[in-house]
């Protein structure tokens, strides 16, 4: 696999290998055959980052080979959305011969949606001035004249210039309902939108007929919380990153959802609050005791759940766990399987043609 070539003819084989590997890893905890959710074989990534290489008068995107660290020119990137590929050509054409935009430019980041919106961030090793703003505004207007719904951002040390906004709004069809998600530049979003839809629909399916309330740790922009709200009386969710919390609050309003409460705090802090170890000003006005959370949802970072959070989640009858690292999931399951059994197992092929696996498990109390 190279950045400009995807071995689509090998997709079935690589997916089968992942299924077998996940099943083997999960064998100590479950004999279930994973439910498998396939990715589109190309144009599945909704975001991409490229370094820029200045080669005389020429200018082009590059990536680095992970093994050899050698430079690879990238003019097309079939793993990324069609919109990113269109923008890659348009950005090079618009920047190459413009000194204000090209000088000291070292990276371009692309974020796109299925609703055909884009934020493009240009990163510089220089101070950005009014000349840059005028040139960037002209480029943005030229891109929009080509029918591209794009927002440009300039970044340099301690500097961020938004020509108009730093977000785009995604619209996803999820189990018969359109969900609106504000996605903020430089904040986490699910990279594979088609796979995200399947993950949300799987989570909805395994939690149907739920009783009581849902607690979610690490909720991001509310991706899962808001989709799952229809299955629960109430949802209480935590997130630490300010931009993600702001996006989640917007998404609650945009989707006309009235049973989700977002709290800005770390999972570890929330564990302390739930256990009565500490009191937090951020929880004033929120009576944790009135929530009857029968289900807890966790989508932790690659490091998995810390030991205190492991203990905390064991108190819930059902644990829905989405993992971007099955190795740390299995490490957590060494503890969680003492009190819970794996009742559902799914593999989500979030990153085709790579070793990476995303998976989901539903755990029910013994």
Swiss-Prot record:
Gene3D superfamilies: 2.40.50.1070, Vaccinia Virus protein VP39. It catalyses: uridine(54) in tRNA + S-adenosyl-L-methionine = 5-methyluridine(54) in tRNA + S-adenosyl-L-homocysteine + H(+); uridine(341) in tmRNA + S-adenosyl-L-methionine = 5-methyluridine(341) in tmRNA + S-adenosyl-L-homocysteine + H(+). One of its GO terms (cellular component) is cytosol. The lineage of its organism: Bacteria, Pseudomonadati, Pseudomonadota, Gammaproteobacteria, Enterobacterales. The keyword Nucleotidyltransferase does not apply. NCBIfam families: trmA_only (TIGR02143). It is an enzyme of class 2 (transferase). It comes from Salmonella schwarzengrund (strain CVM19633). The active site is at residues 324, 358. The gene is trmA. This is tRNA/tmRNA (uracil-C(5))-methyltransferase. GO terms for molecular function: rRNA binding; tRNA (uracil(54)-C5)-methyltransferase activity, S-adenosyl methionine-dependent; tRNA binding. It holds the Pfam family tRNA_U5-meth_tr. Belongs to the class I-like SAM-binding methyltransferase superfamily. RNA M5U methyltransferase family. TrmA subfamily. One of its GO terms (biological process) is tRNA methylation.
């Amino acid at each position: 696999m190279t950045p400009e070539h995807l071995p689509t003819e090998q997709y079935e084989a690589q997916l089968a290998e992942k299924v077998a590997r996940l099943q083997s890893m999960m064998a100590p905890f479950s004999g279930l055959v994973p439910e498998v959710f396939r990715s589109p074989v190309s144009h599945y990534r909704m975001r991409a980052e490229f370094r820029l290489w200045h080669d005389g008068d020429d200018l082009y995107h590059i990536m680095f080979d992970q093994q050899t660290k050698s430079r690879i020119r990238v003019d097309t990137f079939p793993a990324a959305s069609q919109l990113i590929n269109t923008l890659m050509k348009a950005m090079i054409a618009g920047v190459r011969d413009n000194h204000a935009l090209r000088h000291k430019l070292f990276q371009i980041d692309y974020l796109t949606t299925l609703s055909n919106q884009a934020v493009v961030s240009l990163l510089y090793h220089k101070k950005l001035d009014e000349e840059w703003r005028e040139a960037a505004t002209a480029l943005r207007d030229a891109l929009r004249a080509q029918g591209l719904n794009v927002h440009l951002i300039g970044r340099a040390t301690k500097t961020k210039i938004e020509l108009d906004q730093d977000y785009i709004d995604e619209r996803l069809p999820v189990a018969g309902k359109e969900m609106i998600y504000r996605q903020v530049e430089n904040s986490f979003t699910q990279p594979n939108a088609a796979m995200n839809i399947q993950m949300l629909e799987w989570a909805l399916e395994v939690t149907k007929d739920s009783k009581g309330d849902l607690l979610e740790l690490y909720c991001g922009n509310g991706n899962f919380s808001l989709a799952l709200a229809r299955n629960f009386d109430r949802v209480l969710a935590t997130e630490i990153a300010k931009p993600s919390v702001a996006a989640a609050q917007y998404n609650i309003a945009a989707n006309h959802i009235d049973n989700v409460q977002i709290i800005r705090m770390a999972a570890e802090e929330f564990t302390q609050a739930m256990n009565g170890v500490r009191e937090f000003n951020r929880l004033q006005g929120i009576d944790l005791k009135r929530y009857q959370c029968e289900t807890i949802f966790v989508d932790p970072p690659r490091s998995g759940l810390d030991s205190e959070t492991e203990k905390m989640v064991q108190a819930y009858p059902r644990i829905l766990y989405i993992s971007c690292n099955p190795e740390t999931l299995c490490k957590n399951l060494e503890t969680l399987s003492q009190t819970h059994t794996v009742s559902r197992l799914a593999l989500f092929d979030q990153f085709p043609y790579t070793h990476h696996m995303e998976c989901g498990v539903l755990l029910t109390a013994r």
